[in-house]
Structure formats: structure tokens, C-alpha cells
């Protein structure tokens, strides 16, 4: 091989390595993440031994869930309101009143980069958040993943009504934005990336919402992104997804051409 030929070959090999690394980085990394902020009027953590005892008395918690207290992926922390007055979430209009009444947020968090095979981590975190809220006389409970503020009464009624508190409708929120996009929040709790779609044509909004709802519900149930086409009105649709960051993807709704 001539020096020129060797050089060209080396360049192509190097480009191939770079491209392979780039494509590998573009693949979405697995992340299951649950995070609740229990908005407490106090500025310190309560006795967590009492919290654990209350959680273990719940009909929805058994020995399997109880073991998660010692799981290194589970964390409870304290965020002081006085030190986070300028945080964006504290100053959002829909949350401002609740934060003004709280001295701190008790953060209940579970994060896993290893694929999970059940929703027991979610069942556990929900009951821990409920127990803490009762223990401290909380102002509210903020679901950071689904971006939803629960009143304590509403949250306790939810737990009393559903001891197995892992249903899709209670954890995932699909919203249509002003720019004709859709946002799906909450799937990340079971290791499925949340979605932000590209703009949808106005006359296809209802169809898009139906397809996205079905995708989200099926992905939640299987704890894995749905890859099969979705059939509506005799047509097949797919969501063409692209990773943005761990736990989040952008998506475009496409009609699959008939064969």
C-alpha cells in the first residue's frame, strides 16, 4: 500500500471510530427517577425511624418494598426554603404560595441507571412521601417528575383509595402546549424517557393526542418504550424518538406508509 493509500485508510478508520462513538452517545441512557418534595412548615427532618414504622404499617407496603429503605438508590434530603428563594421552581406562579408557607422541602428520591423490573420503587416512594406529609403537617406534596402539586388531603385520599399506588393515570401527565406541541411527564418514574413532541398540524391535534396517550400508557405498563406502530382510523402511526438527555426525548409523530 502506498503512503497516500495508507493515510486515506487511516483517516476513514478514525472517522469510523468517531462516528461510532457519536452514535453510541446519541442513544438514550436508561434512567428511572422518582422525586417528591414534601413541603414542610419546619426546617429540619423529622424522626425517620417513625417514618419507616408508619410506612411499614401501610397495606400497600410489604417486606419487598421495605427493603428499599437500605437501597443506596433511595435518598431523603432537606432543602431549606431560606437558601433557595431564587430557585425557578420556588417562584413559579402555581407553586409560589405553597413554598411561601413552607420552611423546607423534604426530598424523597429514587434514581436507578440499572433497568428495573417492577414498580415497587414507585410504590415505596409514594408511601414514604405520604407518611412524611402526615408526620410534619405538610403544606403540599410536589411531584417533581410529573410537575404536579398535590394537596396533602388529595394525596392521602389517593393512597387510601389505591393501596397499589402505581397506576398510569396517577403518575403521568400529557399536556398540549400553546405552540402545538405535546409534553409527556412522569414516564421517567418507570425508566421510560419523558417526551416533548415537535409541533403538530392544528387539524391533527386530536389524532396526535390519541396516539401519544396510547404510546404513554403502553410504555408505562411495560416499563419500556413502545416500539410497535399504533393503529388509529385504519392508519399506522409511530413516534420517531431522539434522545435529548437521560430521561428525556424529543419525538415526531409519523404516519407509516402502507406496504
Residue spans of the language-model regions?
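Internal, hydrophobic cores of structured domains that mediate oligomerization or house catalytic pockets
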Residues: 74-171
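Structural alpha-beta junctions
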Residues: 56-64, 127-141, 217-225
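Transmembrane-cytosolic junction motif
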Residues: 18-33
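N-terminal low-complexity, intrinsically disordered segments
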Residues: 39-98
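Aromatic/basic-lined ligand-recognition segments
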Residues: 96, 144-259
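Feature marks short, highly hydrophobic, charge-poor N-terminal signal-anchor/signal peptide-like helices
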Residues: 1-9
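Short glycine-/aliphatic-rich beta-strand segments at the starts of folded cytosolic domains
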Residues: 32-40
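Core hydrophobic alpha-helical membrane-spanning segments
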Residues: 10-17
Amino acid at each position: 500500500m502506498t503512503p497516500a493509500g495508507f493515510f486515506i485508510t487511516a483517516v476513514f478508520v478514525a472517522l469510523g471510530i468517531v462516528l461510532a462513538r457519536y452514535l453510541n452517545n446519541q442513544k438514550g441512557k436508561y434512567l428511572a427517577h422518582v422525586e417528591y418534595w414534601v413541603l414542610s412548615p419546619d426546617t429540619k427532618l423529622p424522626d425517620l425511624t417513625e417514618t419507616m414504622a408508619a410506612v411499614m404499617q401501610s397495606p400497600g407496603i410489604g417486606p419487598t418494598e421495605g427493603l428499599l429503605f437500605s437501597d443506596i438508590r433511595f435518598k431523603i434530603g432537606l432543602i431549606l426554603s431560606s437558601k433557595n428563594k431564587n430557585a425557578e421552581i420556588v417562584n413559579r406562579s402555581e407553586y409560589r404560595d405553597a413554598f411561601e408557607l413552607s420552611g423546607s422541602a423534604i426530598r424523597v428520591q429514587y434514581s436507578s441507571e440499572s433497568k428495573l423490573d417492577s414498580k415497587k420503587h414507585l410504590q415505596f416512594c409514594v408511601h414514604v412521601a405520604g407518611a412524611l406529609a402526615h408526620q410534619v403537617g405538610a403544606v403540599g406534596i410536589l411531584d417533581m417528575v410529573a410537575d404536579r402539586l398535590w394537596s396533602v388531603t388529595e394525596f392521602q385520599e389517593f393512597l387510601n383509595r389505591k393501596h397499589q399506588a402505581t397506576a398510569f393515570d396517577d403518575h403521568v401527565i400529557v399536556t398540549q402546549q400553546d405552540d402545538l406541541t405535546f409534553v409527556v411527564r412522569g414516564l421517567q418514574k418507570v425508566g421510560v424517557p419523558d417526551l416533548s413532541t415537535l409541533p403538530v398540524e392544528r387539524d391533527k391535534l386530536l389524532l396526535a393526542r390519541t396516539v401519544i396517550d396510547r404510546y404513554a400508557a403502553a410504555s408505562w405498563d411495560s416499563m419500556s418504550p413502545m416500539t410497535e406502530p399504533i393503529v388509529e382510523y385504519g392508519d399506522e402511526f409511530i413516534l420517531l424518538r431522539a434522545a435529548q438527555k437521560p430521561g428525556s426525548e424529543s419525538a415526531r409523530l409519523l404516519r407509516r406508509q402502507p406496504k
